[in-house]
Amino acid sequence: MKKPKLSKVEKIDKIDLFSSLWKQRSVRVIMAIGFLYLVIVSVEIPLVFKSWSSSSVPLDALSRLEKLNNEQEPQVEIIPNPPLEPVSYPVSNPTIVTRTDLVQNKVREHHRGVLSSLRFDSETFDPSSKDGSVELHKSAKEAWQLGRKLWKELESGRLEKLVEKPEKNKPDSCPHSVSLTGSEFMNRENKLMELPCGLTLGSHITLVGRPRKAHPKEGDWSKLVSQFVIELQGLKTVEGEDPPRILHFNPRLKGDWSKKPVIEQNSCYRMQWGPAQRCEGWKSRDDEETVDSHVKCEKWIRDDDNYSEGSRARWWLNRLIGRRKRVKVEWPFPFVEEKLFVLTLSAGLEGYHINVDGKHVTSFPYRTGFTLEDATGLTVNGDIDVHSVFVASLPTSHPSFAPQRHLELSKRWQAPVVPDGPVEIFIGILSAGNHFSERMAVRKSWMQHVLITSAKVVARFFVALHGRKEVNVELKKEAEYFGDIVLVPYMDSYDLVVLKTVAICEHGALAFSAKYIMKCDDDTFVKLGAVINEVKKVPEGRSLYIGNMNYYHKPLRGGKWAVTYEEWPEEDYPPYANGPGYVLSSDIARFIVDKFERHKLRLFKMEDVSVGMWVEHFKNTTNPVDYRHSLRFCQFGCVENYYTAHYQSPRQMICLWDKLLRQNKPECCNMR
């Protein structure tokens, strides 16, 4: 049924009604609110769905997360902690808290500077008869005075003008060959022949010598010895230290513990020997790696071999009558007392090869960390008379040995900007002024870890001033460019390394409010993720001391590293972690700095023992300490699944980092 149509008058009445309602203000407000509500709802609904969909984690992301958690070195996300309060100190000693806060504010203002803000004054090194460190305090005071004077010269710029290098563009001559007579060589200091530009592929050394007759060892006629050592040394690799032994060749004519003639070969870097290669008269196994297709060890006739004059006669007879059967020739030990020999050492593609009297004796593969151009010195020592030395096929171009030239001035290696606020771990790296290549290797290896590049962990080199002015000028430039060096203003000395450790504690605990302080050396490779995981094992808030611990060690009273009773009157050392790598909690670091600046910190020349002593004092007077021991903080060299690896050359540092990136597991670079 159709609805009746409205008349024209009725339509006009409805329009008038709507118009009158619209003119009412309340109706207009209600309609505006309704329209706004519709707009908000239409916008919110897609966002809700999007948020819901993004909260659903896909399976592949979960699997990646699970894989990361199962890895030995997860990329730990470190959330910045609130400013650390010195809660570990007794409440009854409020002066420490107040003073620490003041010092912390002072240090934070200057922590981006080059110079350490550790406070030295005239009373810092006053000798104290209480702890037997009179001589150490005297030398520290002298070093501080010299360093302060030198730093003022550096700051003023006068030193840079005084240091001139007239021969900067004049390279050393690179002769194609070098030769010396026996008398010339034997009269040289340390029996050393310099090879100005090192060796190159194909270089060879020919030495004519005569082993001396065996003599009693230390006057004991039951122990006769006759041995000599030929070494290739890296004279320009380090300064002020024993040069690395790139090749150590040591024939022992009377043998050693085996009582059989033996040839031992090895390499040594910073007093750390690698795995020895011993040739004892047995030919290398067929499945053993060769060096340029040569075996590492050739066979020679031993005393227990069945090789008589009759067998030699039969061999010659068979040769004369034309027997087709091939008879293998065997030779005696290549060196005989009081008999001349001609030794040739040649540099191959994969290693060094040694021939004696025209016969191959042994080959030694190149070790990671050294190159041919590093071999700039030849030494011969021991029970031998040298008749002549001839070195040929030397490089004619001059390689760069200046350590500072190893610096790669690229912004890629500069320290990242550290935001305000505390960091999780501060790593202080002990370094010497002239260790330019060592610092560069650290920058290009483990300091590229994501935790350091993201500034969640901060690493800095701590360097004292060097005895050579030109080194200090270059060092200051390096510090200003890379922004990762803290100069401690005293003249560097091995006995005063402990001052750098105090500076590390001060810089880490006060300048960066770090929760933990780690100390290591510039030849230490740090597997950062593994160290962090080890720290996380200690309950939150506990004072900790982590490293390769030594218990009940006694001081050496004789020899090169002797410790006098005046220096250390006690019979035992306290428990201490080996110096190449250890971790302290920040409350211990603050304790050390406070004692030092109040002139109450006992100093000892052995840095790692000093830290153990300070930690024990903290434990006895302030808070319990959680000691954690692990052999993976390596004192000597590198071990499987290391946390830190020590005595690593710059090339080994790069090798360790490359292996860690490619294989995601710690693998040593002891070999080539």
UniProtKB/Swiss-Prot annotation:
The EC number(s) given in the record are 2.4.1.-
Q: Where is the signal peptide?
A: none
**Tissues of expression:** Expressed in juvenile leaves, stems, cauline leaves and siliques.
Keyword annotations: Glycoprotein, Glycosyltransferase, Golgi apparatus, Manganese, Membrane, Signal-anchor, Transferase, Transmembrane, Transmembrane helix
Q: What happens when the gene is disrupted?
A: Reduced levels of arabinogalactan proteins. Defects in root hair growth, root elongation, pollen tube growth, flowering time, leaf development, silique length and inflorescence growth. Increased sensitivity to salt stress.
Q: Which PROSITE patterns match?
A: GALECTIN (PS51304)
Q: Which residues are glycosylated?
A: 306, 620
User: Which Gene Ontology cellular component terms are annotated?
Assistant: endosome; Golgi apparatus; Golgi membrane; trans-Golgi network
Pathway of action: Protein modification; protein glycosylation
The subcellular localization recorded is: Golgi apparatus membrane
- Residue ranges annotated as transmembrane are 29-49
Q: Output the SMART domains linked to this UniProt entry.
A: Gal-bind_lectin
Membrane topology of this protein: Single-pass type II membrane protein
One Pfam assignment: Gal-bind_lectin
Q: Which GO terms describe its biological process?
A: arabinogalactan protein metabolic process; protein O-linked glycosylation via hydroxyproline; root hair cell development
Q: According to the UniProt record heading this chain, what is the dependence of activity on pH?
A: Optimum pH is 6.5.
Q: Which GO terms describe its molecular function?
A: carbohydrate binding; hydroxyproline O-galactosyltransferase activity
- Per the record, ranges on the Cytoplasmic side are 1-28
Question: Where does the record place the Galectin domain?
Answer: 191-392
Lumenal-side stretches of the chain, per the record, are 50-672
Q: Gene3D superfamilies in the record, alphabetically? A: 2.60.120.200, 3.90.550.50
Task: Outline what the protein does.
Answer: Possesses hydroxyproline O-galactosyltransferase activity. Transfers galactose from UDP-galactose to hydroxyproline residues in the arabinogalactan proteins (AGPs). Is specific for AGPs containing non-contiguous peptidyl hydroxyproline residues. Utilizes UDP-galactose solely as sugar donor. The addition of galactose onto the peptidyl hydroxyproline residues in AGP core proteins represents the first committed step in arabinogalactan polysaccharide addition. AGP glycans play essential roles in both vegetative and reproductive plant growth.
- Family from the record: Belongs to the glycosyltransferase 31 family.
**Record-linked PANTHER family:** BETA-1,3-N-ACETYLGLUCOSAMINYLTRANSFERASE, HYDROXYPROLINE O-GALACTOSYLTRANSFERASE GALT5
Record's protein name = Hydroxyproline O-galactosyltransferase GALT5
